[in-house]
A protein has these predicted regions:
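A glycine-centered beta-loop-beta connector
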Residues: 33, 41-57, 105, 113-129
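Short N-terminal signal/transit or membrane-insertion segments
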Residues: 14-20, 49
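Tandem CBS (Bateman) regulatory domains
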Residues: 1-16, 54-90, 97, 102-108, ...
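The conserved cystathionine-beta-synthase
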Residues: 20-37, 44, 85, 91-109, ...
Length: 144
């Protein structure tokens, strides 16, 4: 069990994740998430992390407009990501322990955490799927 304590965020994170800019639309974010089967997208401007948008953010925002006319709904989908993103999200550093990432995912009930370098530039994202994949790989290695 002690060898699991040595796992770092960089060992499991998704490097160079798909991202959005603050000026892109909710519709574009929803489409990108659906096409790639992901649930969160970091929002960046020139490589600097500004926030994160999740499928939950989008569903919640769209639920507020569920009863509007189709033309209005189309307008809602053109809302900029910056309007509903979570600004200044929790972040991790590549050399943080995976245990810290897991604790944050559980305590905050979130699906992913952006990983930034010392200059606050986005270098990856660690999700609960990344964590599960890591442990599945370790289990398979132990059984081999």
């Amino acid at each position: 069990m002690a060898r699991y304590n040595r796992i770092k965020v960089v060992d499991v994170m998704t490097k160079n994740p798909l991202v959005m800019t603050p000026a892109e639309t909710i519709g574009q974010a929803d489409e990108l998430m659906t096409e790639n089967r992901i649930r969160q997208l970091p929002v960046v401007d020139e490589g600097a992390l500004l926030g994160i948008i999740t499928d939950r953010d989008i569903r919640s925002f769209l639920a507020q407009s569920a009863l509007v006319e189709p033309e209005e709904r189309a307008k809602v989908l053109r809302t900029n990501v910056r309007e509903i993103m979570t600004a200044e999200p929790l972040t991790l550093a590549p050399d943080d322990d995976l245990r810290e990432a897991i604790e944050l995912l559980i305590e905050e009930k979130i699906g992913g955490i952006p990983v930034v370098d010392q200059a606050e530039g986005l270098v990856g994202i660690v999700t609960y799927v990344d964590v599960l994949r890591c442990f599945l790989n370790r289990l398979e290695e132990e059984q081999a």
